[in-house]
Amino acid sequence: MVGLPLCGCAELPKLEHEPLTIMTGCRDYSALEKALKEEYPEVNLEFISYNGYNTTSYFQRLLEVGQIPDIYTTKILPDPALQKEHLIDLSGYDFSAKYAVSRLNECSVDGSIYMLPCNFSVLGIYYNKTLLEKHGWEVPTSFYEMEALIPKIKAAGLEVATTSLEYIGSAFQYLFNLGDTIFLRTPEGLDWADDFLAGKVPADNAWASTLPYVQKWIDLGLINGSWCGKPEKQAAEHFAEGNTVFFVHSGGFRYTQNTDGTGDRYGLMPWLSIDGSNNRYITSTACYFGLSADLELPRNKQKLEDALKFMSFISTEKGQRLLSGDSTQFLPLADSEAFPNEEYRDIMEQLNAGFSAPLAYKGWEELIVPVGEACLNWYAGKSTGKQAIAVMDRALQSSLQNGTASCAVLPEDLTLEEAAQLVGNAFAKAVNADCALISLGGYHDGKENKDGVNGRLFQGPVDDVIISTINPLGWVNTIKTVTLTGQEIRQLAKEGFDLYGDGKPFPYVLTLSEGVKLERERQYTVAICGCTAEIMEKGDLQETSICGMDALRSYLSALP
């Protein structure tokens, strides 16, 4: 019989709470993790690296196949049906009540809230506040007021507007921003968008009231077609010269004439509706956060408690400031003092009153380029609004008919290592290499590896979008090779890719082409993804002309 010591006064070791998993998604959570630990020492986070080229599509794919981490993040709100199936309804928890109603409405799915927003930027039309004050002009709050102001601007020898029109996406965005003030954000407009993207209704009738309005913006010089194709930087610099009242821009901009805070002061106004009753600021949310429905399983009771603490923490101003996004962005919280001056409090009041529209155009991705090109021609006076909408109809039909063709159907899920092996086989075959060394993604003390395979593949059809989620070369980069001996290859495969030179390498997956057996002193051509400067020099790194996407597409298409 073994005697057990009496230890009633001794403290038993505390079991650590099982960590909550969260994918990095090209974000740095180190500051958030540190602050969370100070607030809730018992809560542990485990970071799963994804630093690939298509975060949005990969995270969407994880949701589709039900393989999400405990804490799920995404840049674009997912399909409502997927949210209902895989995420927890957060609407009944106290922390959800801390968010502004307008932000919750953006996330609502039939009255439930499965994802909560983090900080966001606000886009609109910049104006030179100093010029307006100098001439005694009020900031217009409707298009009627804008129409009345423009003759005064011209009479004073000032330019009405500079418009950023370098990019096709900007031209597309301006059309939709003005559409948001007329029809698109109405219940009928939202229904139309769903029906249109499904191919059930045409575009022309829905845009009938918006096109004349956009044309007025063009005619008055607010959308200034003379800037079509000119560099965005040049447009910004021209506005900053101080002789232009408005800057129509698709992104953010500073609020003073000079970068050091001196010179003219700028303000931000919404996209104006005709009578001012439906003005719209455009919001771009940095990220949304939700919790996996698996946390509600009985075995995950402790993890659920910790996950709710995490959500409670990020639902505070302190937590929001530590999330992804610029520190000057707005917060989605109802009682947040996002900025210390009256102007930005006014913006928040308008946002909270519902005078906003999201920037993300989910479902429109295939139409942005053709419609944006048509809009550029329209703004430049080379075509009409009706022609642009006709392009929208044709582009939608082409997208529906052609879709994104699948090049293979996988019979089962692949692990990260198996996905890397597939990439290695594809790259080696494409460039006639003897073998391949493909590094893996990972998370080492906040450091990640973008040069390697970061994602898995799952059972089912594989198209270009899915390929892009695992391709370490992105959409256009080409395959690189080195020449090494068999011994050097084996040694690298054993040691891994020491990207940061800190002795914490990322693993390699070694694949050999058919019939190849590595001999110690013989030299071989190696397709490689992720190598140090030393290996680049030793192996005489060469860049081939073969695109990684083409290689993967060809390899997958040939699979049985």
Language-model segment annotations:
Residues K75-G124, E138, E147, Q173-Y174, ...:
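Hinge/lid segment of periplasmic solute-binding proteins
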Residues Q401-P560:
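Catalytic centers of hydrolytic enzymes
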Residues V2-D79, H86, V139, S277, ...:
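Conserved N-terminal structural module of periplasmic/extracytoplasmic solute-binding proteins
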Residues S96-L131, V160-L165, S277-I282, G354-G363:
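A structural signal for short loop-to-beta-strand junctions that line the ligand-binding cleft
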Residues D28-Y29, G325-F330, R345-S398:
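C-terminal capping/gating helix-and-loop segments adjacent to ligand/active sites or protein-protein/ligand interfaces
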Residues D194-C228:
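Glycine-centered hinge/linker elements that transmit conformational signals in sensory
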Residues Y114, L123, E147-G199, T244:
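Extracytoplasmic/periplasmic solute-binding protein
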Residues E38, E46, H135, L220, ...:
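Extracytoplasmic/periplasmic substrate-recognition and gating elements
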